[in-house]
């Protein structure tokens, strides 16, 4: 047993007293990573929120249309691109740990190529937003405006895919502060841009969508300039290379499950709001569920940052052949997630009677939101655990296993449970959210079991094999003739 522990196999028991210094060091590394990643998530999330806020001053109809178009864009485009790009958490993270620095730029270029191609059919879907919304029963006037808004957002889908690639590329190198800076500059300028395009240009609500596109592209340009000219990226970015066009299929084998992991989860939450419209008193139920979803989404930024830190630390250590340190990183991030979720959950419960006032002055809505807050607190606890465990999965390259667990959790357990509670037992919107709680329990249990019984020595070997097989050039000395310096 003692030998197994020394080799880093399976056991995830908590650190011994003698390991306190390494635990402290690991906590510092993860907080140093997760803090900026949380800030980046919030700043990029604010981009869409700011646009919708400006549109809200034009009237309720444009506001409804912009909100629906934004939600439609998230479901049909942004979630897929974010999930696909998360394959770089594994590939770039492990390559950086193995000191195969040239591979990071190649892997990012592969991802850029794939995501740009994927954006073409997604943009066609966005161009037909109006027809699709009408087909699914949306009000014609809202669908028309939403379709117009989505068309002006089409350039943003190409930028968003590239932006995700740059984010993961720099994150894998533990170089996240430039991402925070560029996101901060972009979001600050976005406020001015929205004001000009919405109120001064004559574009009206379409100006907000165009502002999204411009801001995303501005962020991409800023990050590209940093990557190209910064000395910190001189080893990982050596210019565009034809090598990136090889081995696309191995990349897709990891990218497709990565996309499914994210999409299956995000789609279930959007389905929650759609189903709330079928309940008795749909206006109240939809309003309250939207408030809960917005609150939950904002709180989710914290465990999402921890998840990014976990995937980076674990992939780096596995790539470097340090299974024991990778296992320690898992222990530490789980402890941080538990502590964070207890604090956030306590705050949610303490403010339950006043939180609804931030969204509505109607007492019925405020009272309903107050009754939902303890459920949200429980959901936040479970969501924090599943987030960091999903980060562990990405760091190890378990995206296929994660996609299977997410499929079973949300669509075999969560959605059916929510439907049963909401419509058969007449629990209403609480029942739909309790269905998500059931899904999170199964998801945490499944990912937790996989993590607990992991042979970390074996994972380190798999990382080495993945790095060696990801390019036909084993030592990755890229031929100068295959590189275009730009």
UniProtKB/Swiss-Prot annotation:
One Pfam family it belongs to: MatE
Membrane topology recorded in Swiss-Prot or TrEMBL: Multi-pass membrane protein
UniProt keyword Chaperone present: no
Keywords: Membrane, Transmembrane, Transmembrane helix, Transport
GO MF terms held by the record: antiporter activity; xenobiotic transmembrane transporter activity
NCBIfam families reported for this sequence: matE
Protein name: Protein DETOXIFICATION 16
Species this chain originates from: Arabidopsis thaliana (Mouse-ear cress)
């Amino acid at each position: 047993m003692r030998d197994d522990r020394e080799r880093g196999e399976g056991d995830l028991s908590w650190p011994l007293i003698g390991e306190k210094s390494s635990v402290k060091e690991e906590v510092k590394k993860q907080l140093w990573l997760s803090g900026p990643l949380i800030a980046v998530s919030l700043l990029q999330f604010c981009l869409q929120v700011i646009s919708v806020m400006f549109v809200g001053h034009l009237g309720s109809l444009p506001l409804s249309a912009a909100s629906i178009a934004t939600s439609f864009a998230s479901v049909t485009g942004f979630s897929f691109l974010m999930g696909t790009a998360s394959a770089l958490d594994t590939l770039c993270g492990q390559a950086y740990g193995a000191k195969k620095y040239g591979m990071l730029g190649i892997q990012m270029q592969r991802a850029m190529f794939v995501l740009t191609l994927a954006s073409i059919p997604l943009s066609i879907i966005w161009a037909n937003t109006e027809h699709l919304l009408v087909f699914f029963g949306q009000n014609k006037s809202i669908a028309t405006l939403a379709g117009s808004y989505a068309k002006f957002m089409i350039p943003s889908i190409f930028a968003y895919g590239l932006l995700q690639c740059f984010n993961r590329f720099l994150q894998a190198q533990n170089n996240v502060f430039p991402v925070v800076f560029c996101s901060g500059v972009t979001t600050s300028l976005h406020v001015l841009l929205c004001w000009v395009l919405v109120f001064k240009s004559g574009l009206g609500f379409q100006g907000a969508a165009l502002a999204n596109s411009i801001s995303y592209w501005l962020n991409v340009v800023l990050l590209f300039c940093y990557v190209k000219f910064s000395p910190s990226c001189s080893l990982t970015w050596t210019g565009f290379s034809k090598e990136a066009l090889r081995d696309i299929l191995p990349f897709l084998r990891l990218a497709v499950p990565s996309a499914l992991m994210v999409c299956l989860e995000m789609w279930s939450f959007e389905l929650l709001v759609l189903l709330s419209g079928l309940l008795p008193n749909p206006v109240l139920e939809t309003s309250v569920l939207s408030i809960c979803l917005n609150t939950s989404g904002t709180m989710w930024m914290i465990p999402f940052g921890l998840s990014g830190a976990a995937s980076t630390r674990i992939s780096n250590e596995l790539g470097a052949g340090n299974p024991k340190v990778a296992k320690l990183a898992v222990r530490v991030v789980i402890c941080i997630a538990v502590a964070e979720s207890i604090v956030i959950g306590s705050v949610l419960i303490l403010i339950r009677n006043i939180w609804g006032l931030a969204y509505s002055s109607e007492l019925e809505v405020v009272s309903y939101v107050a009754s939902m807050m303890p459920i949200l607190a429980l959901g936040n606890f479970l969501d924090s655990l599943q987030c960091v465990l999903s980060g562990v999965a990405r760091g190890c390259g378990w995206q296929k296993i994660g996609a299977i667990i997410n499929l079973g959790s949300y669509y075999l357990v969560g959605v059916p449970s929510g439907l049963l509670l909401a419509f058969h037992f007449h629990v209403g919107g609480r029942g739909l959210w309790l269905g998500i709680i059931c899904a999170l329990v199964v998801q945490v249990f499944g990912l937790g079991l996989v993590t607990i019984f992991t042979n970390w020595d074996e994972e380190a070997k798999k990382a080495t094999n993945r790095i060696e097989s990801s390019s036909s050039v084993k030592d990755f000395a890229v031929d100068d003739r295959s590189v275009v310096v730009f």
